[in-house]
Structures are given as C-alpha cells and as structure tokens.
Amino acid sequence: MQEQYRPEEIESKVQLHWDEKRTFEVTEDESKEKYYCLSMLPYPSGRLHMGHVRNYTIGDVIARYQRMLGKNVLQPIGWDAFGLPAEGAAVKNNTAPAPWTYDNIAYMKNQLKMLGFGYDWSRELATCTPEYYRWEQKFFTELYKKGLVYKKTSAVNWCPNDQTVLANEQVIDGCCWRCDTKVERKEIPQWFIKITAYADELLNDLDKLDHWPDTVKTMQRNWIGRSEGVEITFNVNDYDNTLTVYTTRPDTFMGCTYLAVAAGHPLAQKAAENNPELAAFIDECRNTKVAEAEMATMEKKGVDTGFKAVHPLTGEEIPVWAANFVLMEYGTGAVMAVPGHDQRDYEFASKYGLNIKPVILAADGSEPDLSQQALTEKGVLFNSGEFNGLDHEAAFNAIADKLTAMGVGERKVNYRLRDWGVSRQRYWGAPIPMVTLEDGTVMPTPDDQLPVILPEDVVMDGITSPIKADPEWAKTTVNGIPALRETDTFDTFMESSWYYARYTCPEYKEGMLDSKAANYWLPVDIYIGGIEHAIMHLLYFRFFHKLMRDAGMVNSDEPAKQLLCQGMVLADAFYYVGENGERNWVSPVDAIVERDEKGRIVKAKDAAGHELVYTGMSKMSKSKNNGIDPQVMVERYGADTVRLFMMFASPADMTLEWQESGVEGANRFLKRVWKLVYEHTAKGDVAALNVDALTEDQKALRRDVHKTIAKVTDDIGRRQTFNTAIAAIMELMNKLAKAPTDGEQDRALMQEALLAVVRMLNPFTPHICFTLWQELKGEGDIDNAPWPVADEKAMVEDSTLVVVQVNGKVRGKITVPVDATEEQVRERAGQEHLVAKYLDGVTVRKVIYVPGKLLNLVVG
C-alpha cells in the first residue's frame, strides 16, 4: 500500500473496475427486497453545477447504503433533453439543438462518472429520442380516445415581430426578450389534458404521502385549491344572456353592490361597440401579461359597461364593470363584488365611487367601521332581511338553499387548478401526434404512423420553428386522405412526468411499460430533487402515475413513497462597480479576501486590484458569477473529498454554504483515514479478536466502535441526517488515532474498527473505501460487503471512566469496571503511566473518591 493518499490515481482505477464489472447493473429479483432510489434527471445544459453534485451525492449515499443492507437497489440516470435553452444555444453557436444536446450529454456523463455515482448506466435514457417519446405520443392518443384530451383556444403571449409565441419568462417588462417588441395577448388553439378530472384524487391522496415534506403537500393543496361555494345567475337588463358568478361567501350576498367581468368577456365586448373608453381599456388589457402572482399587487382598473344586473334576492339594479383583475381563463370570467367584506372589491369601489354596503357585524356585535378597509372576518349577518342574526355557516346554507329553490343558484365545488395546456409553439420538443383532415376533422395520428419523428437536421433562424417553417413536414395522409400534422410540440414537463417508470424497462418494445418490471420496482422508494418543482413537475408526476394506473400499466396509486428536497448551494458573491456604474461580478475563486478574527470577510479585491463589494452568501448562479465548477474541485481534491464535504457541511434539506476551507478539512480527514490504515497494515497480519480477553480500555474502545455503528446506521437509515453520521465517524477516528497498537489484541481490535469505519464511510467516499477495504483484506469487493452491525453486548456499559487528580490537578483518566471498589480504582490509577510519575517517591496523605467519577490523591 502506498503511503500517500493520491485520489487522482485510485479514483479512475476504481471507476474503471465498476464499469468493467457492471457493478451497479440490476435486474428484477423476487427473492430480494427492492429499493428504487431516484434523483431528478438533469437537463443537459453542458456542465454539471454544484446543485447537481449535491442532489446526486445524496442519492448515491442512500443507494449505496441500501445496497449494503442487502437490497436489490435500482439507481438510474438519464437526460431531460428537450427544451428552450437548446434552441437559444443552437442559434448562438450556429448549430442545431440535437448535436448541441448530444454533445452536452456526452460531456456531462463523463462528469457524473468522475464523481463516482453508482448508476445503472444500462438504463440511461434521453427524452429527446424517438425510442422514448414514441410511447408518450401513443399514450396521448389513448388519452384523447378516452376523452381526457381536448383542444380549445387560449390566450398566449405573442410577439408580432417574430410572429411567435413566448413563454411567460420570455416576456420582460411587457416586451419580447429577443427583439424588444411590445408583446400582445393572442388567442390560439391549444391542446389540454384534463388534470381537473383527477383534482379530488390528487388532493385526497396527499394524505397517503406520509414521507413527503409538509411544505410540498401544502403547496400542492393550495395549487389544487378546492373550494365549496355557490354558482349564482344574474339577469342583465338589455342583454341577451345571463351572467354567472361563483362565490365561496354566499353569506355576504346581500352586500353585493356591483359585478365585474373580464375585459375579454362577451358582455364587455358588446358594450365596447358604443363605448370608445371601454374599447381602449379592453385593448390595454389584451396587451398586458398578467401572471397570477402579479394580480394581487397590480393597480386595479376598470370601466363601467353601462349594463345593469338585477340582484336575484333584493331586486336592486347593480352596475356591471369591466375590470383588469378578472381573467377569462378563471371560472366564468365574471365575479360578484362585496366591497364591505372583500379588500380588493373595497379598493375598487372606493376608487370609482361605488356603493359599499356592510352586511356582517364586527366581532363585538357592532356595525363595522368601513371608513379605512373592508371587514373580511366571518360573523353574524345584519342588513340582510330575512337572514339577519344568522352566523356564517347558517347564512351560507340558508342563502344557498334559497337561491337553489329559486332556480338561480347551485352549490358547487370549484378548483383553482386548471387543465394542463401541453402545446408549445417551439421546435425542440416531441411533436403532438394529432392530424387535421381536409374537411377539418381532427384525429389522433394512426398507430402505424407513430412515432411522429422530430427532424434533427435543421437550420435555426431563432424565430420560427423549423417544422412550422417547412410546409412539407406537416403533409401526411390518413387512409389515403391528405392531412396536416400538428406542428406544436409537447410541453417538456410531459417527458419528465413518466421517465421514472420507463427506467424500469428502458428497452421494452411492446409498449410504454412492461407491467411486470414496473410493478416490481415501483413506487420509487425515495425521490430527490429541489423544492422549486413542488407544484409543476411533482403534480404532473403524480397525475401521470394515476393515468398509467388507470391504463393498467402500474398497480400503485402514487409514484414515490418518500420525497427529499435538498437545499440550495450558496457561495460568496463579489462585484466591483464599472466605469458606467454597472456591476461586474467576480468569481469567489478570483477574490483575494481579508477576514477578521471571527473569519468574516472584511475586505476583498481581485487580481487586477479592483476593490470588491462583498454581498454575502447567495445561491450559486451565472448572473452573480459565483458558481464553483465541480470539475475543478474534483481535479484539485478528488471526488471523495467533494462528496464528503457536500454531505458533511449541512443537513441535506438545508442550504449549504460552499467554503473551500471546509473542502480542505474534508480532504485532511480522508488523509488521516488513509494514514491510519497504512500504519496498521504496515505491521503485518492480525490475530483474531478475542472479545473475552479484552482489557477495560480495549472494551471501552470497542464500545465506542459499536456505539458509532449504531448511531451512523440510525442517522443514515432512519433520520437521514448524513452530516451527523459523518461527525460520529470523525469522532471515532480521533479515538482510534490515539489508541495503542502494540499488543496483539490492540491490533485485532483496530482491524475490527477500521473495517467498520471503511464500510460506514463507503456510501460517502466509495473510491478510497474500495481501496482501503482491499488493503485491510476485507472479503470480496466492498460494493458487495454487508453494512456493519452493532454488537449489543459490546455496547453495554460494564466499565466507567474515572478522572484521576493529584493534589486537585487532573493527571489522567482510567477505565475501571462499574462495580470496582475504591481499592481497585487506586490500584489501577497507580498503573496509569501519566499518573504514576506524580506518585513516585511521595506519600499519599488523603484519598477523595467519588464513585465511578473522580479519584483525587492528596500527596505531600
């Protein structure tokens, strides 16, 4: 064994061994308990970042640990390869998205291998290949036949200059990110999947997910947004149709003083025919992108349509306004306004001088003061005719019942969740498998024409999708009849909604899933990824699982038993102010810093001498130039060091602060482990451990070893507090480094301890552990070694540590049996060499003994 720890030599050797032996390739085995460990698949952006490294290290630690418990562990990896960034990169680099994507996959695959992750590479998939997306296309046509897919016009962001649709994030301050043209709202036909048909099940089954974070479940509950209320119909004077609104507060209905409709509502459109002010307002609304998040904070505007609705219970005429806070895509596009008891309605009514009528008493039973704001709390009714004196629940039911009896109301359960719009007017995605015949009939692409293959050899102009720009691509025939293919592609969330299931049978050619394999591996035992996916991906992921279950492909209700959301990786961020006042961000690697005695940064400059402003720790990002390249760190310290730091620096679900000093600390620790094994093995063969012949000190050390095994097992397996597991191993290592190694049993005990340490570290730092296991002559490869088991007998406290003082000063510590007498303790103290030298040639005048704790010898 070489004396120095050289990760650059051992890591590539061990990785080659795993590749050649196909160590992590698995198949279904009914005789073994399965464990499916999955990290969210990466987008092949070109290079791994530290967020990836953290996510995949957590997954690998769990997978390797479960494997050592004897389970059949599946840990696959693949590439979420479609998406907009590839289009931008292709235009910029004068290439096509496909070659750019495949080059990135090849590069990042090498980076993943360099980090030593134990993936089953035989199952690798890229979602941009026809072999993958063909099954998604087929499934979509099946959903269409079941009535779960439909097409309707929907508002999108439209750039009139580029003649293209923009995603919300491509609209910056109301303008196109590419050409700065003012963006318009445009209605275009789009495909939708009926996720609302599963709203109740998606909501109720959250209660089955005991091992998902509460934050994620709450976000999904709120996103689905189930509410119970009443749908109410109003007659409108001089208008051919009625107006329907939905309210969750029918108890406030007697305080409704106006209605508001969306600018795109047919009533507003009709009123605008003779109202230029309203027409201009509608125009303004059409060109304003309103994300739901902005609705609460934006200025509320409106115009009176001139129409009057009739309150069904009071008979009063109330005005109908067009307002910018009502959206056509939500509910009926009309809302009832109760300004006395809703703050938004109150602000709008105050602004435009509309009637504000209180109908709920304050908590103390007095009439509410509405001079400053609405009273939004529930309470007892007044000013409400026959409903006066009723509390919230009684009033809700009484008014709902009355409206229902009159035929103008209906109790309804509503959802905030909208159907999933899966059309994208982009090129780099899976083509939507639908065709339109000459007579306008729309139908699914026939099975014998699937997959509809996306051409990869294309020229990108950065504006129009190549398949939209090429009329020939869309031409096809169905049963001899000319037809046109759909030129929209799927939302890329489609591919990531079912990849986890395809990993169970990536080569299967008879259909989307091989049910036998899928039902052996599914559900996923632990799914690891960022909390930013809480509502979109993780909701579609659950939805798709239920769709596949109802198609008879899987037999479970939920895709993943446990969800672990890892924290973000933060790093120091620095900038200097340029000549024009702009901020130039400088990588922390290039910052020369001065720190105070507490280690805080007080001054910084770069190599060019710029004074740097330190903005603290923030999420690693391109915009702040504070990302640390994992590859550079692996080349500098080795993959094991980077992995160990990632798992030690912070609990997995908390933010992690990147500190190179911490990385250096992890590296020093691994060098100490290497050194201890080197020194131990250099002394030759080891005798068998005789547990019955151990001294008290040896028993105490062995107790520490087995207590550490018990703690680390619990920390990794149950608590998933990986940082505390590593801390416990480090603490044990400190004790082993000080332990005597002269006697035969000392060395036998050290052998047992080191074999345990190397196995406990193996999930975190597999390369060094693979090598040290061989040096310690462990049986077989460590990848197939069992996890160490704590010996209950060894952990029994049959001895205790007594502090020995001479004249009140601590001179040593001794281990004695729990039931040792004072005489035995004194005798043992005399044998301890650190104490003995203070007793040489002196007389013990007095002995103070605190049983099992302290022995103070007063000498003179």
Swiss-Prot record:
<dbReference type="InterPro" id="IPR015413">
    <property type="entry name" value="Methionyl/Leucyl_tRNA_Synth"/>
</dbReference>
<dbReference type="GO" id="GO:0004823">
    <property type="term" value="F:leucine-tRNA ligase activity"/>
</dbReference>
<keyword id="KW-0067">ATP-binding</keyword>
<keyword id="KW-0963">Cytoplasm</keyword>
<feature type="binding site">
    <location>
        <position position="622"/>
    </location>
    <ligand>
        <name>ATP</name>
    </ligand>
</feature>
<dbReference type="InterPro" id="IPR013155">
    <property type="entry name" value="M/V/L/I-tRNA-synth_anticd-bd"/>
</dbReference>
<protein>
    <recommendedName>
        <fullName>Leucine--tRNA ligase</fullName>
        <ecNumber>6.1.1.4</ecNumber>
    </recommendedName>
</protein>
<keyword id="KW-0436">Ligase</keyword>
<dbReference type="InterPro" id="IPR009008">
    <property type="entry name" value="Val/Leu/Ile-tRNA-synth_edit"/>
</dbReference>
<dbReference type="InterPro" id="IPR002300">
    <property type="entry name" value="aa-tRNA-synth_Ia"/>
</dbReference>
<dbReference type="Pfam" id="PF08264">
    <property type="entry name" value="Anticodon_1"/>
</dbReference>
<feature type="short sequence motif" description="'HIGH' region">
    <location>
        <begin position="42"/>
        <end position="52"/>
    </location>
</feature>
<keyword id="KW-0030">Aminoacyl-tRNA synthetase</keyword>
<dbReference type="GO" id="GO:0005829">
    <property type="term" value="C:cytosol"/>
</dbReference>
<dbReference type="InterPro" id="IPR025709">
    <property type="entry name" value="Leu_tRNA-synth_edit"/>
</dbReference>
<dbReference type="InterPro" id="IPR001412">
    <property type="entry name" value="aa-tRNA-synth_I_CS"/>
</dbReference>
<dbReference type="Pfam" id="PF00133">
    <property type="entry name" value="tRNA-synt_1"/>
</dbReference>
<dbReference type="InterPro" id="IPR009080">
    <property type="entry name" value="tRNAsynth_Ia_anticodon-bd"/>
</dbReference>
<keyword id="KW-0547">Nucleotide-binding</keyword>
<feature type="short sequence motif" description="'KMSKS' region">
    <location>
        <begin position="619"/>
        <end position="623"/>
    </location>
</feature>
<dbReference type="Pfam" id="PF09334">
    <property type="entry name" value="tRNA-synt_1g"/>
</dbReference>
<dbReference type="InterPro" id="IPR014729">
    <property type="entry name" value="Rossmann-like_a/b/a_fold"/>
</dbReference>
<dbReference type="Pfam" id="PF13603">
    <property type="entry name" value="tRNA-synt_1_2"/>
</dbReference>
<comment type="similarity">
    <text>Belongs to the class-I aminoacyl-tRNA synthetase family.</text>
</comment>
<dbReference type="GO" id="GO:0002161">
    <property type="term" value="F:aminoacyl-tRNA deacylase activity"/>
</dbReference>
<keyword id="KW-0648">Protein biosynthesis</keyword>
<dbReference type="GO" id="GO:0005524">
    <property type="term" value="F:ATP binding"/>
</dbReference>
<dbReference type="GO" id="GO:0006429">
    <property type="term" value="P:leucyl-tRNA aminoacylation"/>
</dbReference>
<dbReference type="InterPro" id="IPR002302">
    <property type="entry name" value="Leu-tRNA-ligase"/>
</dbReference>
